[in-house]
Amino acid sequence: MAAADGDDSLYPIAVLIDELRNEDVQLRLNSIKKLSTIALALGVERTRSELLPFLTDTIYDEDEVLLALAEQLGTFTTLVGGPEYVHCLLPPLESLATVEETVVRDKAVESLRAISHEHSPSDLEAHFVPLVKRLAGGDWFTSRTSACGLFSVCYPRVSSAVKAELRQYFRNLCSDDTPMVRRAAASKLGEFAKVLELDNVKSEIIPMFSNLASDEQDSVRLLAVEACVNIAQLLPQEDLEALVMPTLRQAAEDKSWRVRYMVADKFTELQKAVGPEITKTDLVPAFQNLMKDCEAEVRAAASHKVKEFCENLSADCRENVIMTQILPCIKELVSDANQHVKSALASVIMGLSPILGKDNTIEHLLPLFLAQLKDECPEVRLNIISNLDCVNEVIGIRQLSQSLLPAIVELAEDAKWRVRLAIIEYMPLLAGQLGVEFFDEKLNSLCMAWLVDHVYAIREAATSNLKKLVEKFGKEWAHATIIPKVLAMSGDPNYLHRMTTLFCINVLSEVCGQDITTKHMLPTVLRMAGDPVANVRFNVAKSLQKIGPILDNSTLQSEVKPILEKLTQDQDVDVKYFAQEALTVLSLA
């Protein structure tokens, strides 16, 4: 920076002020991003006495600039002289925490939380707590909202008198007139509870929690559900029934589906927090109701949690609860009218197999899996197929294979290319589970069909799929079943299919090794150097470059080099370029 020039040490601040006042927002943004450089040049004293006051006074800019400023100030502790001066950063951050734009306020709060840890206890009480109080008592809801996120970081390190004040301020925010503030308080209630003493959690947090959980606004009530998880973790088991469960029961039956959705979404966390006894008496019936909820979003959220909820049930009653109380609800969800619900269930239902064991899986789950494999919604079928490994470990896949096949074939030919892509990605896994005979008989032709799909992404995925299959089944299998079919495509009238032969050879050569590549695949590549389409010819050059390292030197010299040299004389500029590149890379030039 120019400050290094000695006498003209005012230069950087002058530039900054100029650029900060420039009409071009990009220049202002750049100067804010260079703030640490400028602070370094000014030194800690002038940063404190000139730069920070200047920044505090000029907070009236574009949100983008303010966001950058809020972020920078969070890392400024050393630039103002270390922890004993860190309180100098509070005024500009306090201003930023009151602006209208939420993103800027959130970033300012994040920076304030970060620097709070660098305050000594006495500085917290002298500087940080007054800031929290000012924000919490501010006229605008924006400042009161920001205050909510600052209580938990300063509470643990202040005196008990100040702690009492902070609790009172937080209580006021929980009953603020503005829903936005109550929302912010509800969202921070859990983390504030974590730093409170247990007696205060019982005497003060619980009443706040109960009030927020019965707020008139559903957006506040649903945030109280999140806090419920944290609060339940803090309380001893014997207090849960009286202090938390009434509120949780009420939330699980709330008139707003968004609150019930939040209960379903947090269900397994709640389950862990309240423990096995309350789970058995309260949460199992609540879970049944959520799975039967009239709102599809809620049923889908509950469906997502089925496997985890069942896993977490205590071992002594797990099987009984699942078979008598959960499974009947699952059976209804399998034929739900909403495809998101069915898809959510299909993504986890296979996970019940290991929990219930072989006999129950065959008798009770298998019929459900088979029904889902025939579902009209591709996502449902796909989710079942992609989770087959759970079932395979318990009952072996043979039980499913007869129904699997039609489902796989339909997905493999689905009109949506993303569905086709997803099934290709599961093919190596399926192949490994079904075994080579089944694969050759039933699935091989599908894998070949994908190589000539009209969507490039499918052809590309199908090519790497071949490589994974060879890794599973071995190169002898590749030589006998895959390579002849791949090489046959080199004579296809469609040049895209001829190019696919080259792409396949590129990946197959890696797994098949020198012998098979030299004897069986190389001759086809060399022959294709005479293809009428330039795109094919330059891909021949690229293929030779790719497989060259696998071949031995005499083959490279006697067979590959002459062909590449011939291609360097091609009339097409791309063919020449790639042929020359291949010669250079293979050190044949």
UniProtKB/Swiss-Prot annotation:
Q: Note whether GTP-binding occurs among the keywords.
A: no
Q: Which Gene3D superfamilies match?
A: Leucine-rich Repeat Variant (1.25.10.10)
Q: Which InterPro entries match?
A: ARM-like, ARM-type_fold, HEAT, HEAT_type_2, PP2A/SF3B1-like_HEAT, PP2A_Regulatory_Subunit_A
Cite the GO molecular-function annotations of the record: protein antigen binding; protein heterodimerization activity; protein phosphatase regulator activity; protein serine/threonine phosphatase activity
Q: Which residues carry this modification: N6-acetyllysine?
A: 280
Where in the cell is the protein located? Cytoplasm; Nucleus; Chromosome; Chromosome, Centromere
Tell me if Nuclease is a UniProt keyword of this record: no
Give the GO biological process terms.
chromosome segregation; female meiotic nuclear division; meiotic sister chromatid cohesion, centromeric; meiotic spindle elongation; mitotic sister chromatid separation; negative regulation of hippo signaling; negative regulation of phosphatidylinositol 3-kinase/protein kinase B signal transduction; positive regulation of extrinsic apoptotic signaling pathway in absence of ligand
The record, for Pfam families, names: HEAT, HEAT_2, PPP2R1A-like_HEAT
Write down any Gene Ontology CC term.
Answer: chromatin
Give me the HEAT repeat coordinates as residue ranges.
8-46, 47-84, 85-123, 124-161, 162-200, 201-239, 240-278, 279-321, 322-360, 361-399, 400-438, 439-477, 478-516, 517-555, 556-589
What superkingdom heads the lineage?
Eukaryota
Q: What is known of its domains?
A: Each HEAT repeat appears to consist of two alpha helices joined by a hydrophilic region, the intrarepeat loop. The repeat units may be arranged laterally to form a rod-like structure.
Report quaternary structure and partners.
PP2A consists of a common heterodimeric core enzyme, composed of PPP2CA a 36 kDa catalytic subunit (subunit C) and PPP2R1A a 65 kDa constant regulatory subunit (PR65 or subunit A), that associates with a variety of regulatory subunits. Proteins that associate with the core dimer include three families of regulatory subunits B (the R2/B/PR55/B55, R3/B''/PR72/PR130/PR59 and R5/B'/B56 families), the 48 kDa variable regulatory subunit, viral proteins, and cell signaling molecules. Found in a complex with at least ARL2, PPP2CB, PPP2R1A, PPP2R2A, PPP2R5E and TBCD.
Protein role? The PR65 subunit of protein phosphatase 2A serves as a scaffolding molecule to coordinate the assembly of the catalytic subunit and a variable regulatory B subunit. Upon interaction with GNA12 promotes dephosphorylation of microtubule associated protein TAU/MAPT. Required for proper chromosome segregation and for centromeric localization of SGO1 in mitosis. Together with RACK1 adapter, mediates dephosphorylation of AKT1 at 'Ser-473', preventing AKT1 activation and AKT-mTOR signaling pathway. Dephosphorylation of AKT1 is essential for regulatory T-cells (Treg) homeostasis and stability.
Name of the protein this chain belongs to = Serine/threonine-protein phosphatase 2A 65 kDa regulatory subunit A alpha isoform
Q: What is the lineage of its organism?
A: Eukaryota, Metazoa, Chordata, Craniata, Vertebrata
